């Protein structure tokens, strides 16, 4: 994803949705979205009225920014979802949730997906006992994700796990907190994904 140089808190305000991009700060009273829940800029409190296309675009931007993907990466995931059997919008969200960078975040090993991508690329995690340094790696049921031995005393991981009860772990994953190990019990289904997204609008956008 191209480097975003502004405060990521502005993205939450722009999309009118808490995207949980700043880790623990998003759960504190310092959260910019909770304090100023309107778009950034001089005229931010006057929310614009969007056209049909604008509404579809904003919905795509929400999901793309939440999972930290570039436009090209997002299009590739959408193309894969469209190729598979089933409802394209739901499949899209399931594929995004099944990524390794999202799973280490959901398990509480990191406090944001961005941090998850950084640690994955630096070989701090194993999948089924093997090094995986690809954040977009798609997990399967039965996969075991664990912090590798040399990384088990990392402060950032310990601090994130200390707050996991507050965030919670989704039902499709199980966490062995003391062992710093997680298991994919099953693939997520749409009902497991509680983010307020209208994925059909994204399908309509890409169908034009």
From Swiss-Prot:
Highest taxon of the lineage: Bacteria
One GO CC annotation: small ribosomal subunit
SMART domains found in the cross-reference section: Ribosomal_S4, S4
Domain S4 RNA-binding, chain residue ranges per copy: 98-158
Database matches in InterPro entries: Ribosomal_uS4 (IPR022801), Ribosomal_uS4_bac-type (IPR005709), Ribosomal_uS4_N (IPR001912), S4_RNA-bd (IPR002942), S4_RNA-bd_sf (IPR036986)
Cross-referenced Pfam families: Ribosomal_S4, S4
GO biological process: ribosomal small subunit biogenesis; translation
GO molecular function, one term: structural constituent of ribosome
SUPFAM superfamilies given in the database record: Alpha-L RNA-binding motif
Keywords associated with the record: Ribonucleoprotein, Ribosomal protein, RNA-binding, rRNA-binding
Subunit structure, as described in the record: Part of the 30S ribosomal subunit. Contacts protein S5. The interaction surface between S4 and S5 is involved in control of translational fidelity.
Family: Belongs to the universal ribosomal protein uS4 family.
Role noted for this protein: One of the primary rRNA binding proteins, it binds directly to 16S rRNA where it nucleates assembly of the body of the 30S subunit.
Name listed for the protein in its UniProt record: Small ribosomal subunit protein uS4
Classification lineage: Bacteria, Pseudomonadati, Thermodesulfobacteriota, Desulfobacteria, Desulfobacterales
